[in-house]
Each structure stands twice: as C-alpha cells, then as structure tokens.
Amino acid sequence: MFPTGWRPKLSESIAASRMLWQPMAAVAVVQIGLLWFSPPVWGQDMVSPPPPIADEPLTVNTGIYLIECYSLDDKAETFKVNAFLSLSWKDRRLAFDPVRSGVRVKTYEPEAIWIPEIRFVNVENARDADVVDISVSPDGTVQYLERFSARVLSPLDFRRYPFDSQTLHIYLIVRSVDTRNIVLAVDLEKVGKNDDVFLTGWDIESFTAVVKPANFALEDRLESKLDYQLRISRQYFSYIPNIILPMLFILFISWTAFWSTSYEANVTLVVSTLIAHIAFNILVETNLPKTPYMTYTGAIIFMIYLFYFVAVIEVTVQHYLKVESQPARAASITRASRIAFPVVFLLANIILAFLFFGF
C-alpha cells in the first residue's frame, strides 16, 4: 500500500523538525522576556516631560521668524505664512561631558529625544513642518529649529475699511497635564521677520509676541498660550480715486439741480445720478468685505443715498410751490439748498469720522 521505506523517512523528518524548532522557540521566549522586563527605549511620544527643576516649571522659550507672508483673504479671513519656529528648553537627562564625548554640541533626530508638543491653535488643517536642526549643549539645553508653512485663520475688523489696520494672530499652545509642568515664554532674539516680507495692498508695521497670562481649558487639560501678532495697515490711497471720489462726484452732479428751474430737467438729473450711483455701488460691492456690522465705507454709501432721497424731496417741493403760485418761497428753498446740502454733507462726514476713528 505504501512505498517501501516510507515510515522510516517520515520519522526522520519529524525528528529533524523538532531539532530545528526547539532552539527557535527558546530564542523567542528569551526575546519576549527581555521586552517584558527591560525598560522601554523612550522616543518623542514615550518620554515623559522632564521633571521641574527646584519645584519650578519647565520653561520652553519660543520664537517665530517670518520668511514670507502672503495670500491675505479678506473674505475668508485667512493668510498664509512661511516661517522658522525655534524652541529651547533644558533637559538634564541629555547633559554630557564635552571632554569625554569629544564634542561640544550633540545633534539628535526628532524621534530620539522628548520634544514639547507645540500646537498652532488657529491653523487651518495642520502646518507643514520640516525639522532643520536639533542640537544639545553640555548642560542639557536643547535648541530645536523647524521651518513650517501654514494657512492661518485670524479674525479681521473692517469697521474702518478702507482706512483699517489689522492684527494678524498666530496662537501657540503647549500640551501639558499640569500648567506647573510646562510654560511657554518668548525668546525675543528669535522673533522677527525678513526685511523683504510684504503683503500686497498692505504695509507691515511690526511683528511681536504677547504672553497670555490666563490659561484656558481644552479637553480637560490646561494649556500655556502665546500670541504672535503681525500688525498691518491697508494701503488706502488707491481706494480714494477708484471708489470714494467717483461716488462723491456723482452726488455733486445731482446738486446742480438747485441751479435749474425746470422741474422735468431736475427730476431727470437727480434720478439719473441716483441710478448711476446704484450701478457704481453694485460694481464696488463685489470688492467690499461682507460683514454683519456697518463699515466706514458702508456708512458713507448709506449717507449718500439719504442725500439723494432729500434731493428728490427738495425738487418735488420746489415744483409744488411753483404750481401753487408761490415762486418766491420756492426760490428761497432752492437758494437755501445750495448752501445747506454741502454744509450738512460736510458735517455728516465729520460725525462719521469721529464715530469710526474717534478724532
């Protein structure tokens, strides 16, 4: 039934398999035991934060150096930034003797040591970061440098548009179980910007950092927070000849009706200039920021509409008085309108400037 000599060959194969697998099983048991009882090799996600020195919190000094800032979107209230992020802190576990080591500075990979978990609060999605350098001094001071790019969300205030100034914020926090463990500080020597940093249509005034004294709760954990502020002001000169002056010229043309005696001509003039103003306003509206509050430009546009409304009433009253055989009274109202409209318009603009700019 079976080939001759089959049973002895099967027995020999089983014996050979036992001789092969028994040593391998023993090695596996030893390796599992070493992994179970040996201390872990700490990496960035495994090393616990260094303990406070002399019952003081661990201070992480931060700095952001702007390389470029671009694509400021008024409607989305976002901007893009390309910059360096520098961190420094002391970890005594990394201290070494430069004489014995033969080096004055040691370099590490990000996975080899503990690194504070710095997060950008108002960044859309996650920042794109490339670690440039991680170096450690003999006393354990760690210098961390990365280059990053991000799209940042920052609320804008358009109340004074187009004469507005804005503060663009970049918020940093550090994750910590207890605020006594890790706090953020500003390294002023590492805060700055390139001289050629610019934003189209804006003047960059300053770039500073502010430490927020009050921590806030996030996911039942307290955070330490920094606020990097980029102060900018809008280049408003182009808005004057392109938006403001055309609206004023159209309005002033309608006032020539106060020097005409023809009712039909006056009505045609006022209504046609009103239509021109509406058409121009629709064209300008596409470039104006959409806000739930009144802006300075919006207030001027609304005020101009009011003057058109009053001008139509004046022309109608003037014609009514003439029909009712009161030409003298109609003429006096017309003469008064020639002075009253410009004066009231000037006073209204002064009031608006005071309300929006606090002069």
UniProtKB/Swiss-Prot annotation:
It is found in: Cell inner membrane. Residues 1-43 form the signal peptide. Tetraethylammonium (TEA) and tetrabutylammonium (TBA) inhibit the proton-activated currents in a dose- and voltage-dependent manner in vitro, whereas the blocker of acid sensing ion channels, amiloride, has no effect. Channel current of GLIC can be inhibited by inhaled and intravenous general anesthetics at and below concentrations used clinically. Ion conduction is also inhibited by lidocaine and by divalent transition metal ions such as cadmium ions. It is a multi-pass membrane protein. Keywords: Cell inner membrane, Cell membrane, Ion channel, Ion transport, Ligand-gated ion channel, Membrane, Potassium, Potassium channel, Potassium transport, Receptor, Signal, Sodium, Sodium channel, Sodium transport, Transmembrane, Transmembrane helix, Transport. The homologous nature of GLIC to eukaryotic nicotinic acetylcholine receptors and other eukaryotic pentameric ligand-gated ion channels, and its sensitivity to general anesthetics, define GLIC as a structural and functional model of signal transduction in the nervous system, also relevant for exploring the molecular basis of anesthetic action. Cationic channel with similar permeabilities for Na(+) and K(+), that is activated by an increase of the proton concentration on the extracellular side. Displays no permeability for chloride ions. Shows slow kinetics of activation, no desensitization and a single channel conductance of 8 pS. Might contribute to adaptation to external pH change. Belongs to the ligand-gated ion channel (TC 1.A.9) family. Homopentamer. This is Proton-gated ion channel.
